[in-house]
Curated annotation (Swiss-Prot):
PANTHER family from the UniProt entry: RIBOSOME MATURATION FACTOR RIMP (PTHR33867:SF1)
Domain of life: Bacteria
UniProtKB keywords: Cytoplasm, Ribosome biogenesis
Identification of the protein by name: Ribosome maturation factor RimP
Pfam family, one: RimP_N
C-alpha cells in the first residue's frame, strides 16, 4: 500500500515541484509508531530553503485534499534530502561525478558490497569510484545494474 501511495503522490507532486523550478528527489510514505508520515524530498542546484519547502507543501496539500489518495490521517513533511541525499536515478549519479558517494550492491564485486569514495566517472552504465583501502588509493568499477543503493557521502 505505501508504495502505491508513494507512486501516486510522486505523480501529483512532480508538476508542482517542476513549476517551482525544483527537483523531486523522493516520496516516502511510512508508518512510525501510531502515525503515518508522507515525506516529500525536494532539491535544486542552488539548494533548498524554507520558502521552497513551504511553497511545495501548500500547493501539494491543496492537490492532496482535492484528489484524496490517502485514506488514513498522516503528517506531510517537505524537506531537502540533506547533505547525503540518495541518488535514485541515473541523472542523479551523473550530477554526482566529482563528489563523495557511498554505494551498496546487490551482490559482491571483488568480494565487497559497499564502496565509498569520490565518483570519478559515470559512463556506459558504470560507476568508477576512487576510494581508500587503509593507506592506499583504490579504484572500484561498479556496474549501475548491480547498484542496490547509492547516496552522496561526506568524505572526511
Amino acid at each position: 500500500m505505501s508504495k502505491n501511495v508513494s507512486r501516486t503522490v510522486e505523480q501529483l507532486a512532480e508538476p508542482i515541484v517542476r513549476e517551482l523550478h525544483l527537483e523531486l528527489v523522493e516520496v516516502e510514505y511510512k508508518k512510525e509508531g501510531p502515525n503515518w508520515y508522507l515525506r516529500v524530498f525536494i532539491d535544486a542546484d542552488r539548494g533548498v530553503n524554507l520558502d521552497d519547502c513551504e511553497a511545495v507543501s501548500e500547493k501539494l496539500s491543496e492537490v492532496l485534499d482535492e484528489v484524496d489518495p490517502i485514506k488514513e490521517a498522516y503528517f506531510l513533511e517537505v524537506s531537502s534530502p540533506g547533505a547525503e541525499r540518495p541518488l535514485k536515478k541515473e541523472a542523479d549519479v551523473k550530477k554526482a561525478v566529482g563528489k563523495g558517494v557511498y554505494v551498496t550492491t546487490y551482490e559482491p564485486i571483488d568480494g565487497q558490497k559497499a564502496f565509498e569514495g569520490v565518483l570519478v566517472s559515470f559512463e556506459d552504465a558504470t560507476l568508477v569510484i576512487e576510494g581508500k583501502n587503509k593507506t592506499r588509493t583504490v579504484t572500484y568499477t561498479v556496474p549501475y545494474a548491480k547498484v542496490a543503493n547509492a547516496r552522496l557521502s561526506i568524505l572526511l
